[in-house]
Regions:
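Switch/connector loops and helix/strand junctions flanking conserved nucleotide-binding motifs
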Residues: 16-18, 56, 82-85, 111-123
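N-terminal intrinsically disordered, acidic low-complexity segments at the extreme N-terminus
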Residues: 131-132, 136-202
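Conserved TIR/SEFIR loop-to-helix hotspot centered on a Trp-containing motif
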Residues: 79-98
C-alpha cells in the first residue's frame, strides 16, 4: 500500500506547471463509479507534486521518499522536459524502485521522441508473441495527450516561444485543460485503477447521466410544489374576493 497514488514530475515552466496542478486536482477529486468492475470504492486519492524547483541535480531525501511511496509516476512532457536534470533523475529513480509500466506520460507538446526524457524513450521490455517466442520491444508510455490542434499543427514554434504572448499562452493552456478534463483524466485514472479506458468512460458517463436525471427530478419536484402553492394561493384569493363581493352585495 502506497502513501501516494501518483507522483507528478514536471518542468517549472508554463504551461507545464498549470497542467500539473490540473492533473493533481482532477485525480484527487475523482470519484470512481461503483459499477467499474474489479475496483473497490475509493474515497480519496492522494498525489505528490513538488512545488519548488530543486536547487541542485540531487533529488534530496524528501523527493526520493515520495517517489518510493508513490504507486505511479506521471510525467508532464514538453519539449523542455528532456532538458531538466531533475525530471530525468525523478524518472530514473522511479525506475529503480518501481516497474516502468507504472509510469504515465502526459504529452503537452511535440512528439514523444522530442518531448520524452531519454529515460522514457530507451525502456525495453520482453513480450511473448502469439507464436510463443519472446521478443524485446520498446515500452510505450503515452497514456494521455493534451495537445490542442494548434500545438499539434506543423510549424508550432513551441511553448518557450509562445510564453512571450501571455494571451496566446492562456488560450492554449485552457484548451489543454479542457482536453484533460473531458477525456484524458479518464485515461490516467484507467491506468492507475488497472481498468480499461472504455470502462472508466462508460461508467463516468452513466454516473453523470444519473446525476443529471436526479437534478431534473429535483427541479421538477420544486416546480411542482411551486405550482401547487401558487394555485392554492390563487384559489384562496378568488374565494376571498367572492366572499367580499357577496358581503358588498348584501
Amino acid at each position: 500500500m502506497f502513501k501516494y497514488d501518483a507522483f507528478i514530475s514536471y518542468r517549472h515552466v508554463h504551461p507545464d506547471m498549470e497542467i500539473a496542478q490540473d492533473i493533481q486536482r482532477l485525480i484527487e477529486a475523482f470519484v470512481v463509479s461503483k459499477a467499474v468492475p474489479a475496483v473497490p470504492k475509493r474515497r480519496d486519492f492522494l498525489v505528490f507534486r513538488d512545488r519548488d524547483e530543486l536547487a541542485s541535480g540531487e533529488l534530496g531525501e524528501a523527493i526520493e521518499n515520495a517517489l518510493e511511496n508513490s504507486a505511479f509516476l506521471i510525467v508532464v512532457c514538453s519539449r523542455r522536459t528532456p532538458l531538466s536534470p531533475w525530471c530525468r533523475r525523478e524518472v530514473e529513480y522511479f525506475r529503480e524502485v518501481r516497474d516502468p509500466s507504472n509510469i504515465i506520460a502526459v504529452l503537452l507538446e511535440g512528439e514523444p521522441e522530442e518531448s520524452f526524457p531519454p529515460e522514457l524513450r530507451d525502456v525495453r521490455k520482453l513480450v511473448r508473441t502469439p507464436g510463443g517466442a519472446v521478443q524485446e520491444r520498446r515500452d510505450e508510455f503515452l497514456a494521455a495527450d493534451v495537445r490542442p490542434d494548434r500545438v499539434r499543427a506543423e510549424g508550432f514554434p513551441g511553448y518557450e516561444e509562445v510564453e512571450r504572448d501571455p494571451r496566446a499562452l492562456r488560450a492554449l493552456r485552457r484548451k489543454s485543460a479542457a482536453l484533460l478534463k473531458r477525456t484524458e483524466i479518464n485515461r490516467i485514472m484507467a491506468t492507475i485503477l488497472g481498468v480499461s479506458y472504455g470502462d472508466i468512460t462508460q461508467r463516468q458517463r452513466e454516473r453523470k447521466m444519473r446525476r443529471a436525471m436526479a437534478l431534473v427530478s429535483v427541479v421538477a419536484l420544486v416546480l411542482g410544489v411551486f405550482a401547487t402553492t401558487v394555485t392554492a394561493m390563487w384559489v384562496k384569493s378568488m374565494r376571498s374576493e367572492e366572499k367580499a363581493n357577496e358581503r358588498n352585495a348584501a
